[in-house]
């Protein structure tokens, strides 16, 4: 994660610090004019002086200020660069170029490079948490972990709450396998308002997902503590609540997950994730229907409604309320006639009922056009072709379904066995029928 750039308050962009130039009779008029904001009069004097003395660093510096005042920023920055080339020991030149670059997007790499050069050339002057963190990050990128650790620790000794340094140091500890130090350091990043919760939840989820069985046994409680830290810091943030629920699912705690997603539905009833997770966490069809119907009272986004319509249609079909099932499939397709998942599910249910097979085939074919390698869609289409007695083509699509991941799916194997039997390939049909029943 990039260390966020701060333009420190004492970096004054168009500073007219006298430098040693005020003692230069050739420069004094230019400086006095600039101090009086008379850039148009100062500019030709600076240009004239550069023609006479092209190695006069101060003349380049002040000409750059004149260009900047006129809005010719590229010329200004080139002048500041030339001043640095002529006198690399003058930190004022670095400062003005640094701030000039920082004023625009697209110069981040140049600004970081310049800041690192300033740190290295003038260490006592720029020994701040920001510069030390920037230096530490650069050293990490160049595999100088020991130096990086020193500078990041120095940054935190100056400001223990400086999140960029804490994050970089924690990551350094994690990659080194020093998990005790990691768990001590990373909360500073998680509790800081320096970064948005979107960044923090995304980062923490990536860390959590790396936990396998062994690491969970060793660090489970400490990983839980990180999630709790984030949730306590932002108790009503939707992303933090969602993360806590997903972590409980990931670690096999569905009841705790359900509580988090119930909170999410309560705090953010128009956020579909809470309803969808609750829908799938319950094993009761009756409760699923209740959750889905309640969700429809709050959700307004088209894609969210389609998802709930599709889920409700499947549950209603399972409970035998087929008219409601087909009603919700139709509602979903009115919102998006090309939704591949809805088309496939609707077509498959029609095939199970042996009704409207022509319509089912058309919908299934449309879903396959969107996702030609989807094993479930291939199975649906192949099975419908079987029901319509197009056995040769049914075999082609069901074989594709097996190739694309359906080789362990009992329904796919069963449908393929039916097709083989219809084609008279009894021995192979028996083989797949037996596999489908294991």
Where are these regions (language model features)?
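Residue-level recognition of tetratricopeptide repeat
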Residues: 31, 65, 99, 137, ...
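Canonical tetratricopeptide repeat
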Residues: 62, 96-99, 134, 168, ...
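Register position in tetratricopeptide repeats
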Residues: 35-36, 69-70, 103-104, 141, ...
């Amino acid at each position: 994660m990039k260390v966020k750039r701060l333009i420190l308050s004492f970096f004054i962009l168009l500073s007219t610090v006298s430098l040693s130039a005020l003692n230069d009779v050739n420069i004094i008029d230019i400086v006095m004019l600039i101090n009086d904001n008379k850039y148009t009069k100062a500019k030709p004097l600076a240009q004239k002086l550069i023609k006479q003395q092209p190695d006069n660093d101060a003349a380049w510096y002040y000409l750059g200020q004149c260009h900047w005042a006129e809005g010719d920023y590229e010329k200004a920055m080139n002048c500041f660069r030339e001043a640095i080339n002529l006198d690399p020991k003058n930190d004022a030149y670095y400062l003005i170029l640094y701030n000039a670059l920082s004023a625009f997007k697209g110069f981040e790499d140049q600004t970081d490079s310049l800041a690192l050069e300033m740190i290295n050339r003038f260490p006592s002057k720029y020994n701040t948490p920001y510069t030390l963190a920037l230096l530490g990050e650069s050293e990490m990128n160049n595999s100088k972990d020991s130096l990086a650790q020193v500078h990041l620790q120095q940054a935190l000794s100056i400001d223990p709450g400086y999140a960029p340094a804490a994050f970089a140091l924690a990551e350094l500890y994690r990659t080194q396998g020093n998990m005790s130090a990691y768990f001590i350091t990373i909360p500073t990043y998680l509790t800081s308002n320096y970064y948005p919760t979107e960044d923090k939840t995304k980062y923490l989820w990536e860390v959590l997902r790396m936990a396998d069985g062994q690491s969970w046994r060793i660090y489970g409680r400490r990983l839980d503590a990180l999630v709790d830290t984030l949730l306590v810091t932002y108790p009503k943030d939707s992303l933090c609540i969602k993360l806590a629920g997903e972590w409980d699912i990931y670690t096999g705690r569905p009841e705790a997950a359900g509580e988090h997603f119930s909170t999410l539905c309560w705090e953010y009833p128009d956020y579909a994730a809470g309803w969808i997770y609750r829908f799938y966490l319950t094993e009761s069809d009756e409760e699923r229907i209740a959750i889905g119907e309640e969700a429809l009272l709050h959700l307004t986004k088209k894609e969210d409604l389609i998802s709930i319509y599709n889920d409700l249609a499947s549950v209603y079909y399972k409970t035998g309320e087929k008219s409601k099932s087909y009603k919700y499939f139709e509602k979903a397709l009115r919102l998006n006639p090309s939704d591949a998942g809805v088309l496939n599910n609707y077509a498959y249910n029609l095939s199970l009922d042996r009704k409207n097979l022509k319509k089912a085939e058309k919908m299934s074919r449309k879903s396959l056009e969107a996702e030609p390698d989807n094993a479930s869609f291939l199975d649906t289409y192949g099975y419908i072709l079987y029901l319509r007695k197009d056995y040769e083509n049914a075999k082609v699509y069901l074989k594709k379904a097996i190739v694309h991941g359906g080789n362990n799916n009992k329904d796919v194997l069963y449908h393929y066995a039916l097709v083989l039997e219809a084609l008279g390939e009894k021995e192979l049909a028996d083989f797949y029928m037996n596999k489908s029943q294991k």
